Amino acid sequence: MRPAHFLASVVTAAAAVIALANPASAAPVNYVALGDSYASGLGTGSYDGTSGSCKRGPLAYPALWAAATAPASFKSVACSGARTGDVINGQTAALSTSTTLVTLQVGGNDAGFTDVITTCTFGSDQDCVNRVNQSKTFIANTLPGLLDNTYGAVRGKAPSARVVVLGYPRIYKVPGTCNVGLSDTKRSAINSGSDALHNAISARAAAAGFGYVDVRGAFGGHEICSSDWWLNSLSWPVEESYHPNRAGHQSGYLPALRAVVG
């Protein structure tokens, strides 16, 4: 090999090594969290006073992820009680063309989660099963269209963002350690509603090209009536009932989200 060619080869190889050793700086992450009370942090007992009835707090998984990864910007507009229409008509205003990451958790309130829990708490086994079946019919027939509209609105407002949708855990360990409270028939019915939500939400997220985080496995062994609960049972304030507690966000939702997003 002639000296000039040899020198050129050395320079080229050195440049490649330098490029590998000094990768381009990662693009800044501008993160917006959307969703309902599971995303806002209701159930953790710690809330930002300025969030009012939305009950957003620093111990919710979006805030925990932001604290762990230090994105360039972070804003949560998740709100207790939010339905798909609230995301479309209100929360998506927080998105822009500069948004690079969106997490979204919604659908439980559309499906009547609160009424299901109320019916199953105060009604008979058959009342509970009937109400869950009614919810599952809604989830199968109506919720997919609502989710499609919501996901389309998110994509329209944040065309370049990575969007990750999060699901809901099963609520009860069946059979479990609880000697009082709901029957196993009721607990199993409620869990079947969680599975129906998973099926609908994961399918529509995939159809939209969004990521999906299934937290049912993460919460396995940590449901209500397990030996280590990551969800509140009937609690005070009552609105915190049947929501992830601090451990549920820190040890359940956060690792599941990081496994998908990093």
Stretches found by the model and what they are:
Residues 1-26:
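Secretory targeting and sorting signals
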Residues 20-32, 87-104, 148-162, 257-261:
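Short amphipathic alpha-helices and their capping/turn segments at secondary-structure boundaries
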Residues 50-59, 126-142, 185-195, 239-241:
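A short acidic, glycine-rich active-site loop
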Residues 42, 86-139:
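Oxyanion-hole/transition-state-stabilizing segment in secreted/luminal serine hydrolases
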Residues 64-73, 145-162, 196-213:
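A structural motif corresponding to the C-terminal end of an alpha-helix
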Residues 169-262:
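Catalytic His-Asp segment of secreted/periplasmic serine-dependent ester chemistry enzymes
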Residues 30-35, 39-41, 73-78, 100-105, ...:
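Structural recognition of the beta-strand scaffold that forms the well-ordered cores
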Residues 27-78, 93:
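Serine-esterase "nucleophile elbow" of acetyl-processing enzymes
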